[in-house]
Amino acid sequence: MMIMNNFDEKKLIQEFSKIQSELSPRIKLENNFQIEEIQFIAGVDLAYWNVNKTKYGTCCIVIIDYGTKEVVEKVYSYGEIPIPYIPGFLAFRELPLIIEAVKKLTKQPDIYFFDGNGYLHYRHMGIATHASFLLNKPTIGVAKSYLKIRDVDFIMPENLKGSYTDIVINNEVYGRTLRTTKNVKPIFVSCGNWIDLDTSTEIVMNCINNESRLPIPVRLADLETHKMRKKLMEG
């Protein structure tokens, strides 16, 4: 499917909605792995910039050793972004660069973290969930800001490290508001695929240090994408 800049947004939304509707019944919010066997965790993030009227993006994937938290690999991709930003359909814009970066990996992550949502999405198809079907790996969404769905606000958790409140919409748990660090704003965790919410929370908390409220792989991927964007813009 090739989509050029002269897009018909209505047709794109129809096509993208159809794909999301076909994939969403295949989501499994249960672990397909043993947590003791996790060795490598990847963080994925993207950054964008404009050159004249053309949008460009860069994706960075950082892999850490789950035990030592040391970085074991970093890869990048970059290129033109022909697909416009349409709320609820971010995956279609970001996945080409993500897949290009994944192809460069020499290590095989056991789990991918995404700077964004997974099940916490209008159709349960945030970037973390959508990407799982192409990566064939468990995924977790970690968002810095809250995606408000059906006018439901999140409930602020206690000001204690590890405290959380579930995000419940129409009697269904979509995700979790998690305070990873005391006296710091919470983050929003949601399952991507092939993992449950309690395990997602445990793994996120095991990747928190004193430097950020974000888990280490996500924070490092965020830093690297901004460095790469600066380098590419200056080059």
Curated annotation (Swiss-Prot):
Keywords: Cytoplasm, DNA damage, DNA repair, Endonuclease, Hydrolase, Magnesium, Metal-binding, Nuclease. The record marks Y85 as: Interaction with target DNA. The keyword Nucleus does not apply. It is found in: Cytoplasm. Its main location: cytoplasm. Its EC number is 3.1.21.7. It is an enzyme of class 3 (hydrolase). Its cofactor is Mg(2+). Belongs to the endonuclease V family. DNA repair enzyme involved in the repair of deaminated bases. Selectively cleaves double-stranded DNA at the second phosphodiester bond 3' to a deoxyinosine leaving behind the intact lesion on the nicked DNA. This is Endonuclease V. It comes from Bacillus thuringiensis subsp. konkukian (strain 97-27). The gene is nfi.
